[in-house]
Amino acid sequence: MTLINKLKQHLSDSQITQAQLAREAGVNAGALSAYLNDNYKGNIADVEAKLAAYLEKKAVQAREFVEAPAFIETATSRQIFKTLEFAQIANCLATVYGMSGVGKTKAIQEFAKSHANVWLVTASPSRSSLSEILYEIALELGISDAPRRKGTLSRLIARKIKGTEGLLIVDEADHLPYEALEELRIMQEEAGIGLVLVGNDKVYTRMKGGISPSHEYARLWSRVAKNTSIQKTKKADTQAVAQAWGLETDEEALKVMQSITETGGGLRILTQTYACRNGSKRIWQVD
């Protein structure tokens, strides 16, 4: 089969668009279209090398990797759902914090997808200042022409979310400075929505310092209605993942899975390990 026929077969089987294939292969979309129609006039050898490499990569992925389920409901995800539901219903401030790799982000993403008026933004080193996190929220709300002035932007967001009975979730909230947290707290109270800060232990420990009335976080701490700590992967989480992958009766696999989830990174490492299982029903042991 010629390379052109292989590419056409791949497009048909995978339902991928030509534009997406071109992006992933690193070739110009027009060049790909011309090549598939056998009338490309440019450097054919260069284009064919990139397209052949693309097909080889896809073959390796299909042979060596297994696509994990988009979402697996676990005991931990249900615990997080309860906190999110509470914050939205009670229009209050809550936190979800703890070890990385235990499923916090997957849970909040699933909740945001399946509930109305739930907005999820992610903070980062470059998106942690007050103006940047407000801009992220504006984009999440569909305000594409959002102004960059902090005061104007904050008032615009507050008007947009007021009366919605909604929920704002900020992932990686440990990146946010005091100024940004205070602004979100005031906005949450004025708009009458729920606000959940998600991240590592710093999300909680910083605000807990506010237990002292003289501490700068005192106003924040006094308004936190619920703190949910997740410090390790639950055994029930591992069992739920095993069941989703059809391994619940494989005692050897269950033991290895449990040992993996007991390390830092927990479910994330387990998912990556299973994805690389070489097409077999065997979990790799990780040193």
From Swiss-Prot:
GO molecular function, one term: ATP binding
Any one of the GO BP annotations: DNA integration
Keyword Transferase listed: no
Signal sequence, renumbered to the chain: none
SMART domains in alphabetical order: HTH_XRE (SM00530)
InterPro entries, sorted: AAA_22, B_transposit_C_sf, B_transpositn_C, Cro/C1-type_HTH, ExeA_AAA_ATPase_DNA-bind, Lambda_DNA-bd_dom_sf, P-loop_NTPase
Binding-site positions, ATP: 98-105
Transmembrane portions of the chain: none
DNA-binding region coordinates: 18-37
Residue stretches making up the HTH cro/C1-type domain: 7-62
Keywords: ATP-binding, DNA integration, DNA replication, DNA-binding, Nucleotide-binding, Transposition
Biological role stated in the UniProt entry: This protein is a non-specific DNA-binding and ATP-hydrolyzing protein essential for bacteriophage integration and replication.
PANTHER family: GENERAL SECRETION PATHWAY PROTEIN A-RELATED, MU-LIKE PROPHAGE FLUMU DNA TRANSPOSITION PROTEIN B
Protein name as it appears in the record: Mu-like prophage FluMu DNA transposition protein B
